[in-house]
Amino acid sequence: MDIERVEQVRAVERLAHRRGLALMPRAGLAAADFVAARLPAGAQVLALAGPGNNGGDALVAATLLQARGYRVAVVMPAGPARLPDDARRAWQDWCAAGGQASADLPAHAPALVIDGLFGIGLARPLDGAWQGLIDQVNAWRVPVLALDVPSGLSAASGQPLGDPPGRPVRATWTLSFIGVPAALRAPGAAAWCGEQYLSLLGLTPAFLAEAVGPCGQATATAARRSGP
């Protein structure tokens, strides 16, 4: 079955948590594999890690890519102090691997950027500091892999957050986990998402169906029929 709403993704995450399935290592591995398939070892990768679990996914990817011979830098504008538990463990693993983090972007553009600043839960406009960082990343014009959704783009509407609208990360690729919100398939979202890919993180169709239940399946089917 297809997962096409943010609430459905959250339902899958809750069931995985109850079953003791750690999804962040799977998401980070999927991101690392995605980068490794498109960039030679030894290249410079910049992972942008935000204050939530999206940042944790980026940290897992950073740790794995460093182990594969990539030159990886991590930027954490909000620092690690308020990371949720799973993301904190990803941060600790990154530090144990010899990694460090900066609050500021480097002077020179990397070969590729991993956008793990904000995920599908972001519902507020970006403030000036976050917007300035994203503007600088966009100005580099290097390949960008957005995890779940380009930061600054609403996963619920497919539109930039804010009034007037902000300027999200302009991704080359967007790698969604578990499901792709239907709004991200809308024509207006394509300019920000780039090419869209999906990783189910090894979860089976039966698991997904159990997580969202019959009502969720019916809603997903209706969304497919009425979507853009």
From Swiss-Prot:
Cell membrane keyword on record: no
PROSITE patterns named in the record: YJEF_N (PS51385)
Similarity section: Belongs to the NnrE/AIBP family.
Record-listed K(+) binding positions: 54, 115, 151
Pfam families associated with the record: YjeF_N
Entry keywords, A to Z: Isomerase, Metal-binding, NAD, NADP, Nucleotide-binding, Potassium
GO MF annotation list: metal ion binding; NAD(P)HX epimerase activity; nucleotide binding
Name of the protein in question: NAD(P)H-hydrate epimerase
Cofactor(s) in the UniProt record: K(+)
Catalyzed reaction equations: (6R)-NADHX = (6S)-NADHX; (6R)-NADPHX = (6S)-NADPHX
Binding annotation for (6S)-NADPHX: 53-57, 119-125, 148
Organism: Bordetella pertussis (strain Tohama I / ATCC BAA-589 / NCTC 13251)
Gene (UniProt): nnrE
Taxonomic lineage: Bacteria, Pseudomonadati, Pseudomonadota, Betaproteobacteria, Burkholderiales
